């Protein structure tokens, strides 16, 4: 399935299936796409979508490790949280949108949970995107399902909705025996806790196996971190997954129609 410019609120500017970003190379020829199962979220952030329909300000905290902080990106503006904020603002013209980047490289789930009070709860977000699992896989540690489950419950108790993001599909991750266990644990945790799951692993595997996009189009030379194209595509897919089927508030809908007419 192509990157869903056909969601109800996509503007003409996002009708292209290709995400264009610096540097302008052969990467620009690769299409940003993903299978339906990677984008369905399973448990959508319904209250977040209600805020959109009501025209209320939106705040998201993206917490995670180096692929949240943006290792491999050419600038802070090219990280996935920054690109996500830009995507949401473009698709929701007139709505105040803030995406806070709370990624710290090298962390595993326990270290992230320990930061929740300062980095998540004090921000009072409407939605939390929790990218987790990659460093456990890299260090041959079992992905701690119980710690993640407890963390999700704390996030929910704070009033935020939650979307989990599993490991990236990258050579250094694929070389480790624990990757499937990590993907399975995070999937099961999201399902059991009734929170969203953005299946980054499946989306990136689709790029490689179905779209036949070489790793160097979306992964840096370290074999682990995404480049600007990879982060931009993930941001677009996450935005479309969050917004799919969302009813726009009248002011935003009018602005979007105006953008299409132009």
Label the model's feature ranges:
Residues 65-66, 104, 134:
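Active-site metal-binding loops of divalent metal-dependent hydrolases
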Residues 82-98, 107-261:
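Alpha-helical cap/lid subdomain in secreted, periplasmic
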Residues 74-75, 220:
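Short glycine-enriched, charge-decorated loop/helix-capping segments at active-site entrances
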Residues 70-74, 102, 106, 110:
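Short gly/ser-rich anion-binding loops that grip negatively charged ligand groups
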Residues 69, 79, 97-100:
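Extracytoplasmic small-molecule ligand-binding "clamshell" domains
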Residues 52-53, 103, 208:
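Hydrophobic residues in alpha-helical segments
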Residues 1-63, 68-74, 89-95, 122-123, ...:
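N-terminal secretory targeting modules
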